[in-house]
């Protein structure tokens, strides 16, 4: 990692400290606050239902009809990410964490009661502060160029690995209580979710998801 940080420091004008590396276990995720007040309810902005029902629909007969038939839930998809602080880097005398992430997205298909792998992504990413783009112009272009330079380095070629992308993160809005590393981890979390959406889109495009072959996703895709 020292050689990689040397390249990043040189290209972005920062100073690497080669500090202690460790893994982050979790990041606090947004959640709903539930209570026992029956008058309160959550109103979704967007509904995925194509047919609007004003009352409950009795599915007893449909459930009986489906007994013994092939399950319509054929695909199962989930994603995971592990994040690590790999260094500290300074810009304008302010120190920022450098976060690395391992993102994995997997999908299995159930055929005749047996599970088999259908599709899998394994991606390595880095998250750097937005200030590493000194000009502040077109972050997407700048960080895409830095990713290419990193992947061309002999260090990465020897290891046989490459980074999928570099994700810029902004300092937390709450400078007093917010943690800088949480901003970087959140970017990697968002990248994982977008990768899940990408896989679903590929399955749809290939015609694998339909009324007879549903996909079950662990967690939200929004």
Locate each region found by the language model.
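Short hydrophobic beta-strand that contains or immediately precedes a catalytic carboxylate
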Residues: 75-77
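Short acidic, low-complexity segments enriched in Ser/Thr/Gly/Pro
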Residues: 129-180
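Hydrophobic, well-ordered secondary-structure scaffolds
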Residues: 47, 65-70, 87, 93
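N-terminal alpha-helical "arm" segments
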Residues: 1-60
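Acidic, metal-ligating active-site segments
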Residues: 85-138
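Short acidic, Gly/Ser-rich segments with clustered Asp/Glu that frequently serve as metal-coordination loops
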Residues: 79-85
